[in-house]
């Protein structure tokens, strides 16, 4: 993993302004992104403490897993004490049976930012769902809604032929989308083929932007600077991921998924149950029901491997955002550097 762009100790360098030019407007809100286990929650809370004498902070979660109630351990959800110390939004807003789309996130986040600003607080958007961040800046086209009949047909086809066969089908109708998806990425393959069958358009065609949309995205980036926590050493992040997964197992993650399975109305193809860790735990519990033995070592191995892959995808997304301010999350003073950079961007003395 290459070293992310470095920041000086004070954070974002002050812009060079022509003589007589007005200083740029201070950002309306801040965003903090990063791969899983990079320290985003700790960083967000540290900034809230540093800003407390100047301005209250409210956190808007940018995480597609934290929206689900009853999924606390496997998502590393902020604790009740952390949520009590700093207001958090877009956490526990859906039952695991319910979907939550990027379009819904954008609408909710934009509304919350306005409400938080009206209260005189700083909106701080924090998370690792890069699609949500991208949708905030670039906007999203009006893609067709989910079609239950088409989804059922695709699931039946996948059961008969396997998801790699559907990935090959996607490559014929939408090679651009297929190129960025793994043959086993059932959720995204299904959605891409669903869009094709419902609209007659490839999913990739919905991501093109007009010039006006591009200008609007540029304005959005100016009003909401993106800071990212990125590791210089991949092994450091892998170690953190393993430690966190072990801690989740110790805290009762398997029992959490067991309770979800016991509801009887959830299944492994739901977006909630496809979340990293939950899918692997669901499969392990299925194996336990079949054989009477829980393959805990296999669950740990597969869960950590899946989380590593998620982190890799998150870093790839971040590197496609050249306007971000990258901070090495594995540096000993990473939290201090992030706080100093954020305070500088806000015009607050460190």
Swiss-Prot record:
The record marks 129, 151 as: Interaction with substrate tRNA. Residues 63-66, 187-191, 274-279 are annotated as: Interaction with substrate tRNA. One of its GO terms (molecular function) is tRNA dimethylallyltransferase activity. One of its GO terms (biological process) is tRNA modification. Coiled coil: none annotated. Substrate binds at residues 36-41. InterPro entries: Dimethylallyltransferase, IPT, P-loop_NTPase. Keywords: ATP-binding, Magnesium, Nucleotide-binding, Transferase, tRNA processing. Its EC number is 2.5.1.75. The keyword Nucleotide-binding applies. It catalyses: adenosine(37) in tRNA + dimethylallyl diphosphate = N(6)-dimethylallyladenosine(37) in tRNA + diphosphate. ATP binds at residues 34-41. It comes from the Bacteria. Belongs to the IPP transferase family. HAMAP family: IPP_trans. Monomer. This is tRNA dimethylallyltransferase. It comes from Paracidovorax citrulli (strain AAC00-1) (Acidovorax citrulli).
